[in-house]
Amino acid sequence: MSATSVDPQRTKGQDNKVQNGSLHQKDAVHDNDFEPYLSGQSNPSNSYPSMSDPYLSSYYPPSIGFPYSLSEAPWSTAGDPPIPYLTTYGQLSNGDHHFMHDAVFGQPGGLGNNIYQHRFNFFPENPAFSAWGTSGSQGQQTQSSAYGSSYTYPPSSLGGTVVDGQTGFHSDSLNKAPGMNSLEQGMVGLKIGDVTTSAVKTVGSVVNSVALTGVLSGNGGTNVNMPVSKPTSWAAIASKPAKPQPKMKTKSGPIVGGALPPPPIKHNMDIGTWDNKGPAPKASAPQQTPSPQAAPQPQQVAQPLPVQPPPLVQPQYQSPQQPLQPRWVAPRNRNAAFGQSGGANSDSNSVGNAQPTSAPSVESHPVLEKLKAAHSYNPKEFDWNLKSGRVFIIKSYSEDDIHRSIKYSIWCSTEHGNKRLDGAFRSMSSKGPVYLLFSVNGSGHFCGVAEMKSPVDYGTSAGVWSQDKWKGKFDVKWIFVKDVPNNQLRHIRLENNDNKPVTNSRDTQEVPLEKAKQVLKIIASYKHTTSIFDDFSHYEKRQEEEEVVRKERQNRNKQ
């Protein structure tokens, strides 16, 4: 009798007579009905490959359902609920009937050792499945899904892995070694995260579960409760370090109370050095307080001595950046700090006198003294009401060139500017003066007025400018050397420059005579407080440094 056929008179959709019957009906069952289950599958008339091969994929299991659970144990018929000996069968696509194996026949032989034996291992030695199940009831397992019974297909046959919340694989322990089922059940409850954080944060859900305890302890031990007891009081543990740590910090604060004043002083240092005029010496004090961190109080007494050198060192780093920046700010706008630095670069003895006195009185450079003796700068009487003459705006890239123009009484513009100035000078000849209104790009003020005294010599290069690209030179005579802010002249607009303010002019921009009179009047009558003379020694020092660099370049080129 073939294992794949039951009764030739039975229709395909007819139910099994013994499926829903009780155990007492087994007396009415004939012995021939059990032959397909007791005999081996020896007839090779199957039209589909044998399922005993563990490497073949299951073709038909998804179409078969299992309405009962094997969680009832032990398997005896005395007083136990009726257990069916025959299972339902699914109709195969080829028209033949295929009977799934029954859990009752766990011994070798029959269908138990052929169909799915190697793959599923449905028949373990111990039939007490109640000890392997989860904390849920048996009825919940059967009602959870169509595959919620113990005969669910393993993840390998379904082509996927166990997903969180998939209750159809609670009884996969049948096809796994002891302990593997509990491991998977424990992993289902776990969430994404490392082991330590999950064990602590999910104390009530993960650690207390039977599945995870069995996995961690090995043979169902209770060793997991040891680490569980620690995180249960983690609120108390968190409260302990949270409270004493702030207290320790607060205690350390007053101990190092002397170090608290320096941080605000640092801000005052930055602000005072650039914006304020007076607190420049005060700003230098905090620089030394943070550097030695050990004892700030005794150093405050010794600070007056080292207070002065730091501001002297700072201008050396700040001043070289001035000619490089297009938006340059005159150092004298910082007043005493840069006035002292200018004198200190050339003469260190002038530092002591620089603090109480004003910046102009500090300057005692011999070159500046000779210039003041030879020229009467900023005259009180000046004829600004010109009857004839021409006035031009001169825009300089750096104040270094202004310093050298005053020192050598020369100037040089661009090629286009030289031609314009030379033509204006030759056109005026002796009819009237040609005045030049000097301003440094980005300075925000005019720095002086000079008169053009000679035509442009195009074949001569002065070689004293901060950049070597300038060619040609002409003589000038400086009349006013003072800083006049742009806000004093911004109201004067030039009709020959799109009616723009005179302060918004380009190099060699000519100013109409009537507007030039207004500009000259304001500059002559303006009472200045700063000028390039305040930083004359500073620029002298920079010129010496540039000459050293220029000589080194020349020596390298010769080699």
From Swiss-Prot:
It comes from the Eukaryota. In brain, preferentially expressed in the hippocampus. Residues 389-523 form the YTH domain. One of its GO terms (molecular function) is ribosome binding. It is found in: Cytoplasm; Cytoplasm, P-body; Cytoplasm, Stress granule. The gene is Ythdf1. This is YTH domain-containing family protein 1. Residues 343-361 have a biased composition (Polar residues). GO terms for cellular component: cytoplasm; cytoplasmic stress granule; P-body. Interacts with CNOT1; promoting recruitment of the CCR4-NOT complex. Interacts with ribosomes. Interacts with eIF3 (EIF3A or EIF3B). Interacts with YTHDF3.
